[in-house]
């Protein structure tokens, strides 16, 4: 969520962009999920558990998982506000993972970055020492590749 807010403020120029969880704003790029808006007693009403996500073919996330259909665990009430999706995508932040039932954005990537993936879900919830999240493995691999490239260039 913070990556989306930062991008909105400093790339899209929406200086007051924020999450409606933090403050009321003219640009709630992260907003309360529609099904949560009528709920006044919030206890026990979060989006909890595993939900499906369809990854875009050719995305870094799809490459990391090695498949297009995944299921990851959630714990939240706030989501990317799809009213801003066209602006984000035109500026280079792509929604590359979407819930097929609700059209909620689950995964974002920066198109011209060696490895920038943001998720709405919590990949750490299903990750273990013996079976780490594919995103964690992909991130470490990308960092190692980057370090190796830098070492070769600086010799």
Write out the residue ranges for each language-model feature.
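Catalytic nucleophile loop
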Residues: 1-8
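Amide-donor transfer/coupling interface in amidating biosynthetic enzymes
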Residues: 9-155
């Amino acid at each position: 969520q913070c990556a989306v807010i930062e991008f909105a403020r400093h790339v899209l120029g929406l200086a007051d962009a924020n999450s409606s969880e933090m403050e009321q704003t003219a640009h709630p790029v992260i907003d309360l999920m529609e099904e949560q808006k009528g709920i006044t007693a919030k206890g026990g009403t979060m989006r909890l558990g595993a939900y499906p996500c369809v990854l875009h073919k050719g995305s870094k996330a799809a490459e990391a998982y090695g498949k297009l259909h995944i299921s990851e665990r959630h714990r939240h009430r706030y989501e990317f506000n799809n009213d801003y999706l066209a602006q984000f995508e035109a500026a280079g932040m792509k929604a590359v993972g979407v819930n097929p039932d609700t059209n909620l954005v689950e995964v974002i990537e920066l198109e011209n970055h060696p490895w920038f993936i943001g998720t709405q879900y919590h990949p750490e919830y299903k990750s273990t020492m013996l079976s780490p999240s594919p995103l964690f493995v992909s991130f470490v691999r990308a960092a190692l590749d980057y370090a190796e490239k830098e070492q070769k260039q600086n010799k």
